[in-house]
Amino acid sequence: MKLANWCWLSSTVLATYGFLVVANNETEEIKDEAAQNACRVRLESRGRCEEEGECPYQVNLPPLTIQLPKQFSRIEEVFKEVQNLKEIVNSLKKTCQDCKLQADDSRDPGRNGLLLPGTGAPGETGDNRVRELEGEVNKLSSDLKNAKEEIDVLQGRLEKLNLVNMNNIEQYVDSKVANLTFVVNSLDGKCSSKCPRQEQIQSLPVQQHLIYKDCSEYYTIGKRSSELYRVTPEPRNSSFEVFCDMETMAGGWTVLQARVDGSTNFTRTWQDYKVGFGNLRREFWLGNDKIHLLTKSKDMILRIDLEDFNGIKLYALYDHFYVANEFLKYRLHIGNYNGTAGDALRFSKHYNHDLKFFTTPDRDNDRYPSGNCGLYYSSGWWFDACLSANLNGKYYHQKYRGVRNGIFWGTWPGISEAQPGGYKSSFKEVKMMIRPKHFKP
C-alpha cells in the first residue's frame, strides 16, 4: 500500500471510513494558500509488510503518534475493488442498453428506414438474431445482478472494518489526550518558589477532600435532594456543577439536558455546545466536553423522559451511552433500547443517530449531502441525514406549522400522522440523564 502522507489519505481512505478528522479552529481558519497545502501530519511505515499483506503504519500528529491497526492497509484494497466493480457495472449497463436497441431494430427493421443486411424483409435470419441478442441481454442482466451482490458484500465488509478501526482509534486517542492533559496540568501547577523541606511537609495538617465522579456517588453517601452538586469525573480535569435527579427510578441520575419552558435558546454554535449553556435549574445543555468526561469515566446508561401538552408521559432507556471527545466530533454511541416512547434514535437504516457525529448550525458533520441539518433544524444534535429525533429543537408552547424544527421524537404516538391544518406536535418537557450501568440504590 503506497501512501505518501496523511493529506492524500484523508481524501481517499478515510473518506470510506465515513468520518473526517476534526482539526483545531486555528487550522480551519488558515487563509494562506501555501499554508493550506502544507501538511504536518504524516503517515509512516513502522516495518515490513507481512505475508498476508498487512502492513504496520503510524500517524504522526504532533505531539501525538498514533499506531494504526495492521488491517488498515486493507482499506485501500477493498476501496479499489468497489471502484472496479462499479466501473464494470456501468459498462454492463451500457452494453445492455446497446443490446436492447439492437433487439428492437431487429424486430422492426423498417422502423428507421433500414433493413437487415442481405434481406428485403424480416425473416428467419432476423428472428435468430433477435433471439441471440435476447440471450446476450439475459446473460448481461445476470452478470449485472451478480456484480451488485458482490458490491453489497464488499461494502458490508468495509463498514465492519471501519467500525472496528474507528473504535480502536477513539480509545487510543482518548488515552493520549488524557495523558497530555495530565502533563500540561502538572506543569501549570508547579510552584515558582522553592519547595518546602520534608519536615515542613510532615508538619502540615492533613486535609481530606473527597471527589465524587457523578450523582450516583452522592446518592450512595446518603444525599437524597434533587439539587446542584459538584462532580469530578476525572481528577486530571477541573470539577464542575451538575443537577442531580435523586427521585426518578431510584435516583442517582446526572442530568445532561432539560427543556421545561423555552427560556433558553438552543440555536447555538459549536463552541456553545462544547462548553454548555443555560440554567442548570431550568433549561440547559451541560456541554459536550463534560458529557464526554462523564461517559468516559464509567459505563453509563441513558434515560430520556418526555411529556407532551396532552399530559402523556413516556420514556426511553438505553443500556449504554458514550460520547467521544471533540477530536472525534463528539461521536455518539448508544446501546439497546427499552421503554415506552419508542426507539427514535435508531428509527431505521436511513435515520439512525447511533455512531453519528455532532452537528451545529456552524459546523456540518452530518450525512446529508445537500446541506447542514443543524442549520436547517436550528439546533445542535447527532444528525444522520437528517433526523428521527432531535431533543434540542426549538421549544414551541403549542402545535406549529412549517419546518419540523421543534423538539422531535419520531416514535411518539401519532406524531407522524397528518394533523388538521398541517400542524406539528410539540413537547412540554424533556430531560436527558445518565447513571452508571451497575448502580445499585
Curated annotation (Swiss-Prot):
InterPro entries: Fibrinogen-like_C (IPR036056), Fibrinogen_a/b/g_C_1 (IPR014716), Fibrinogen_a/b/g_C_dom (IPR002181), Fibrinogen_C-term_domain (IPR050373), Fibrinogen_CS (IPR020837). CDD domains: FReD (cd00087). SMART domains: FBG. Residues 73-167 form a coiled coil. Residues 1-15 form the signal peptide. Its main location: secreted. Gene3D superfamilies: Gamma Fibrinogen, chain A, domain 1. Keywords: Coiled coil, Disulfide bond, Glycoprotein, Secreted, Signal. Residues 102-128 are annotated as: Disordered. Glycans are attached at N25, N179, N237, N265, N338. One of its GO terms (molecular function) is peptidase activator activity. It is found in: Secreted. It holds the Pfam family Fibrinogen_C. GO terms for cellular component: cell surface; collagen-containing extracellular matrix; extracellular space. Homotetramer; disulfide-linked. This is Fibroleukin. The gene is FGL2.
